[in-house]
């Protein structure tokens, strides 16, 4: 029982954001309450969750969206609660998505372990998970109340006597309500953001031209795609995951149907139009969409090994240098692992390329001996290995994983048809490779690259990578490399894109495109694709321009009232990274401490009452949008769960 009158005063904690990460904090808080000594004294807790959308699914995973929007991870991957994650005691309400969908097959639409669920299905999981967590919290003696507020937080300020006061505006438009708390957790998720200067010019030009429409970066489920007219020419900029969601809405969402053809991967689908589709013209810097993921049974293929980027090798680098530089320390080791996994798989599955099984094994032995010889950088290793490959397979080029990610870097095309044929060939082969899974040398090379990316994420979060390397390496070239190769959609999304092209409803504009507005509407050109008459770059015009991307995850670009207030009043500050010249560059996220990620104010002081979780940690973490992985380490692949555990512990330390 409480020991004093002061100890009886309830502690008030506010979760600003009721999506998956807000749920994580309260699941971790529940687990810690369930593991406490029942005889220990405590202060009652008054818990508040504020979100304009339903708690659990929040905005992104809300349960009223189209079933055509897919997750980018298979069922076995995500969790919003500690589910067999080492070092974390699960609460009585804990359940991973895979555990939930096995006992709720109808609500899960029958999705299987290796399939990619609809986002609405994940929202159903989050809804039920929150129901269990909130029910368990309300039954705890320590919890005096748990209140959900369907509202938006528009400001957060400090009270002179300690704690914070938040201003809430309800979803019905009524504002002015305040909420006082001893501590707050900012689990904000995706936020609205300002357009860039270029985007703003295009939006303004569209507003001045009757019949032109500009759709800026947005969560696809927040857009009414029905406003795009049938037959309209739509320029779609970006060929990542949002683009595939948009294609689904503009085709299947309008009554079109994909049929299986029985043909090989890459030609597995035929599209039957409804007659209500627009014509879609896609463009991106690289000129190709994200490639399909390998069809494997784990997030990193089981057969991938990091022989060179090993724990021992990295620890030796840290002992010698104190910190890591991706280009100088990590990439030479990871590049060797990429090469080794590629050719080891080729020897196992395609030995005839290297002269048969005996010759292939001999080649691999010589290659491994070459790779084992330390001291080479990636270019030297590649040159020596290419000389070795020429002795066994003179007609083969040595693996250039960077060229795979940007295949048209040095190419030009005489006509759009030439370019389209190259894209189709590349995507059809990518579908074949995805189907081969662990038997594909290419997919195993990508798997090694992906495994290295996961290691880098952990080292960045642990402060083991220099700021300058994050700027000049991770952001500049490594992130685009791994995103394009290993963060793509399931193969069926690429099959659908190819089927739409064969149906005459989709084409690609070309690499490094530019967009302007003229009398014909929006006009896009690629300097690498000529027109049919040799008169310069081919151009495509349209009445719609759609930015197929999420609003940028940069707090400095945030346009929500809360984000602006926090930064303008100095309650929060933008994090910084020191470049190679010693200049401070703005980071994507807030300035925070290490775990439990307390917010720092503009004057550098640490705010003991405000914690940050999720996307706005992008200044100290990399890849903050991805979910926690079920069964994985909370210091690594389940990092957001580890962050939530630390925040819950810091909150309860006050009780």
Task: Mark where each language-model region is.
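Flavin (primarily FAD) cofactor-binding/catalytic cores of flavoenzymes
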Residues: 1-63, 108-654
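Redox-cofactor-proximal catalytic regions of oxidoreductases
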Residues: 50-108
